[in-house]
Amino acid sequence: MKKLIILSALLATLAACNNLENNNQQTVSTTTVVNTLNSTSNILQGIAAYKQGDMIGAYNALKNLSPASTNLETYSTYLNVLQNLNKNQELLTALKSGSEYFGSSKDYVLNYANILTSKFNDTNTATNVLENYLKLYGNNSEVEKSLANIYTSTKR
């Protein structure tokens, strides 16, 4: 049934593209349409697998996810999958890539710092991430609390 729905959407999109060509308007390539549909399908499959607890299935569907092509909620799901599968190097790379697109989000910054401290014991980078957020976006009690927790946990 899902394949039928996707196929119907693809045919409708192709027909719309053909209609645009016939009207001498800006055209969208068939390859672009197919790639967009495949990407959307992968994201939906990945989220469904994640919600069912299938981390490997979620990883396989989301592993090519780019922060530029998604929203914060979906990207956070991808980060959770990487954490659950202990794909540490990919997780660090994804965190850094995501900060370029979601660095203005308090939730992303808090999650980033939490992962750095809890999974990698990297309090220096976590501190920098939180301090940079405060410098750019002003005071925030949650960010300040997280920063204070790092400061107190590293003092001995």
Label the model's feature ranges.
Residues K2, L11-Y78, N84, Q89, ...:
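N-terminal leader/linker segments that initiate helical-solenoid repeat arrays
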Residues Q52, L85, K119-F120, T154:
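Structural motif corresponding to the intra-repeat A-B loop/turn of tetratricopeptide repeats
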Residues M55, N88, D122-T123, R156:
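TPR-repeat structural position
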Residues N64-L65, S97-G98, N132-Y133:
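Canonical positions in the second alpha-helix
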Residues P67-A68, Y101-F102, L136-Y137:
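Structural marker of alpha-solenoid helical repeat scaffolds
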Residues T77-Y78, N111-Y112, E142, S146-N149:
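Canonical tetratricopeptide repeat
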